[in-house]
Every structure is written in C-alpha cells, then in structure tokens.
C-alpha cells in the first residue's frame, strides 16, 4: 500500500489539517456519518452551544490521523490497521478546490 497523504488531526481539526496533505486541484470529501463521533465531543458541543462547523474546525472529533490511499487499497489498508487501531473509511478525494468538505 502506498500512502499518498497523511494528516495528523490536531488543533485546526479537519478543515485546516486535511488540506495540508492534498495537492492543488483536489478536495477531500469526508462523510460525517462514516463513524460515530465520541460522546465527549457531543457533550462539549451541546454544553458549550458550539456549532458543528466550529467543532470540526477546532477538535479532531475522535479521528487522530487521516490517510489518503488508492481506492483499490482500502480493504488491504483497513485489514492492516485493524490489527492494532480503530479505523474508518471516511470518504474520498475528488477534483475540486483544495479543501476538506464535510458532508
């Protein structure tokens, strides 16, 4: 498996960190329903009355690292990662302006 991009989701969340791994001319489309957001982030959003966009721009929402790989390598990558990590297929890379688009 060739890792084409890697992003550590820290301060700046999805919106600031994911685009750093992308070349010009593509965007990362992240499906928010592709995993269960941990309860602590839901509680923080509700208690602090924080809008969803701000949550994804400030926190990692339970995702510590994002990898970009060839779609043909998804199964092999997931199998390898599940040997010691919790992992999810979050979305895909598409043509577009460099950004992280959450849908």
Regions found by a protein language model. Give the residues of each.
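Glycine-/charge-enriched secondary-structure boundary and capping motifs
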Residues: 1-103
